[in-house]
Amino acid sequence: EMCIRDSSAADLLTYLYFEEMHIDPENPKMTDRDRFVLSKGHIAPGLYATLAQRGYFPIEDLKTLRHVGSYLQGHPDMKHIPGVDMSSGSLGQGLSAAVGMALSAKLSHEDYRVYVLLGDGEIQEGQIWEAAMFAGARKLDNLVVIVDNNGLQIDGAIEDVCSPYPIDQKFEAFNFDVINISAHNFAEIDAAFKMARQTKGRPTAIIAKSIKGKGVSFMENQASWHGTAPNDEQYARAIEELEKVGEALCQK
């Protein structure tokens, strides 16, 4: 399976798991670990690939994605997948779960941080803003919300379906410190998460402007690829383009 819905957040997931979060793949349930909630659970393959590369489970297991009997199903399952802190897939609920984790840390006087990745179409759900209101009111400065702002959802452009813009001003209204970045610029990603760590007395929202299908020319910014699998020829072409992107990154 290969869907463009995962690629807009690939750089963000890479930074979180390899640079930002305090985690230990050999001890995935350690009590002081940072927590991550993939609220847009339908990009599970991207999360699974990141977890496998980080050492939570064998990379070979990725080939069992959505097979009968596999623990790697279409949405993350905290009961069966090492490194997954919250089951997700029903859009709009992940921020509430993350807020609960962040509040728990405050009440227990623990130092772990909580990160949650939202889709920009997902924030059309009202529950997102109830959770945001609570997080801001409780000054949860151990919470970082990341919005994958690729501008598209399964039915088309988010502006045509139900525009959530201006996203940054909405989070600011709920007492968030807001940072606007490119989701594909590691220098900006790094600076944003460092800034979030320094912010006290309010949660942080990182609005990450991204490109759906990033790295594959014929898939970029095409909502029609949201849940569509490529044929063999398209797959080969996509892999060829992505390998070139990877080689270019390694040379930097």
Which stretches of residues belong to each language-model region?
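Thiamine diphosphate
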Residues: 83, 87-90, 95-198
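Hydrophobic alpha-helical scaffolding
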Residues: 37-40, 157, 161, 179-182, ...
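Short secondary-structure boundary/capping segments
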Residues: 54, 161, 220-224
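Glycine-rich beta-alpha junction loops
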Residues: 11, 42-43, 47, 150-151, ...
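Glycine/aspartate-rich loop-and-adjacent alpha/beta segment that forms the canonical ThDP
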Residues: 186-252
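Cofactor-binding active-site loop characterized by glycine-rich and histidine/acidic residues
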Residues: 8-137
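Short, small-residue-biased leader/transition segments that mark boundaries at the very start
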Residues: 2-4
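Structured core elements
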Residues: 37, 144, 180, 205-207
